[in-house]
């Protein structure tokens, strides 16, 4: 996993799995603490996401909601959206609407 932060957006690349969950949690919670509004997690360049990571993102969103904001996923692939739905985590993690290719 590689990451970069641009104001309220955490941009991730690579694979998100159990091996990077602790590091990702530390980075994300730090961003939640210092961001006055919603935090966006951009996973548009992520190769794969596992259930451990999605559960951690759901808990991070719950923590953010206590402070009046949210953790919002951006750039979810069809596979990630399907996994969120099948795992019943979709209601626990806000997801930006998919951009339509013909909207450009």
Give the positions of each predicted feature.
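STAS-like cytosolic regulatory interaction modules
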Residues: 1-52, 58-104
């Amino acid at each position: 996993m590689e990451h970069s932060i641009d104001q309220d957006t955490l941009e991730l690349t690579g694979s998100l799995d159990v091996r990077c969950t602790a590091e990702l949690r530390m980075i994300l919670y730090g961003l939640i603490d210092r961001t006055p509004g919603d935090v966006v997690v951009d996973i548009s360049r992520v190769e794969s996401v596992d259930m451990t990571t999605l559960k951690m993102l759901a808990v991070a969103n719950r923590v953010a909601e206590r402070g009046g904001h949210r953790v919002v996923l951006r750039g979810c692939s069809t596979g990630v959206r399907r996994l969120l739905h099948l795992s019943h985590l979709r209601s626990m993690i806000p997801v930006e609407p998919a951009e339509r290719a013909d909207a450009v």
